[in-house]
Amino acid sequence: MSIEIRNVSKNFNAFKALDDINLDIQSGELVALLGPSGCGKTTLLRIIAGLETPDAGNIVFHGEDVSQHDVRDRNVGFVFQHYALFRHMTVFDNVAFGLRMKPKGERPGESAIKAKVHELLNMVQLDWLADRYPEQLSGGQRQRIALARALAVEPKILLLDEPFGALDAKVRKELRRWLARLHEEINLTSVFVTHDQEEAMEVADRIVVMNKGVIEQIGSPGEVYENPASDFVYHFLGDSNRLQLGNDQHLLFRPHEVSLSRSAVAEHRAAEVRDIRPLGAITRVTLKVDGQDELIEAEVVKDHDSLAGLARGETLYFKPKAFQPVANL
């Protein structure tokens, strides 16, 4: 099921949440709407679902304009950040709920419902919890049950609003890898909202970077990371450094794109070591460059030659190995 978003705008009083948004999502794609709080990504997701009405523009599902269709008529599955499971129902009954609420003429028999629910619980690898209640589950398990419930009614489109935002970092990482594998199996057109660039990079086929109600860039994870369309995209997609030059330009580069040396070598610039922070397999070194207020961060492997006996206040020499020149505004 393809999705076309045509010239969609939305205001909340004087606040412009979306400004003339255009986006095509292909059938079977997993697309991330990525951006900071207030950028319009959740509003756009809610408009796709039919939970919000745009002030202008159209939403088209597979050639059919659904802009005036009620949310119940759009056949979308929705997974929220906070699970929204029924506390008084077992896992089985939560997943079966949507099937049992279908109109009588469309409702499958109880044996068919049972088979469908167990199929979905097996798919999310939690069939062994069918008789448990939500309060007996971990956060990650609850979110997988919420996803199974959304899939039970066989939606044409799956929408996920920060689905892993309420979980701890380790569980989030496990679940997003699981979601990427699951999407390959079910091949269902899916759109998910996130402010976590690592999550978007790991899960999505394409990323839509949003800021202040507009789309800054659309592309594959590799495209938006390696060829950012704007200063905003570059900074939002990962840690970054800014090195001022003397010709009304500055360089942008990532902490892992820095060469370090204890001695002065060609094209390397002197800087004072302000902090040395071991981070497991890597070490982050914070540097102060004469003539600019912004600090420079470099990340190197923990046994890098430049780190041996290094202390705060000493001089290191650094050079960006890859960078983007940008004109000062």
From Swiss-Prot:
EC number(s) per entry: 7.3.2.3
Task: Name the residues that bind ATP.
Answer: G35, P36, S37, G38, C39, G40, K41, T42
Q: Name one Pfam family in it.
A: ABC_tran
Q: Which stretches make up the ABC transporter domain?
A: 3-237
In its UniProt record, a GO molecular function of this protein is: ATP hydrolysis activity
Identify the main location: membrane
Q: Where is the signal peptide?
A: none
Question: Where does it reside?
Answer: Cell inner membrane
Keyword ATP-binding carried by entry: yes
Give the reactions, separated by semicolons, that this protein catalyses: sulfate(out) + ATP + H2O = sulfate(in) + ADP + phosphate + H(+); thiosulfate(out) + ATP + H2O = thiosulfate(in) + ADP + phosphate + H(+)
Q: Kindly list the GO CC terms recorded for this protein.
A: ATP-binding cassette (ABC) transporter complex
Gene3D superfamilies reported in the protein's UniProt record: P-loop containing nucleotide triphosphate hydrolases
Record key words, sorted: ATP-binding, Cell inner membrane, Cell membrane, Membrane, Nucleotide-binding, Sulfate transport, Translocase, Transport
Q: How does it sit in the membrane?
A: Peripheral membrane protein
InterPro entries named among the record's database cross-references: AAA+_ATPase, ABC_SmlMolc_Importer, ABC_transporter-like_ATP-bd, ABC_transporter-like_CS, Mo/tungstate-bd_C_term_dom, P-loop_NTPase, Sulph_transpt1, TOBE-like
Does the record carry Nucleotide-binding as a key word?
Answer: yes
Function statement: Part of the ABC transporter complex CysAWTP involved in sulfate/thiosulfate import. Responsible for energy coupling to the transport system.
Question: How is the quaternary structure described?
Answer: The complex is composed of two ATP-binding proteins (CysA), two transmembrane proteins (CysT and CysW) and a solute-binding protein (CysP).
Could you say which protein family the record assigns here? Belongs to the ABC transporter superfamily. Sulfate/tungstate importer (TC 3.A.1.6) family.
PANTHER family cross-referenced by the UniProt entry: SPERMIDINE/PUTRESCINE IMPORT ATP-BINDING PROTEIN POTA, SPERMIDINE_PUTRESCINE IMPORT ATP-BINDING PROTEIN POTA
Give the matching NCBIfam families. 3a0106s01 (TIGR00968)
Q: What is this protein called?
A: Sulfate/thiosulfate import ATP-binding protein CysA
Lineage of the species this protein comes from = Bacteria, Pseudomonadati, Pseudomonadota, Gammaproteobacteria, Pseudomonadales
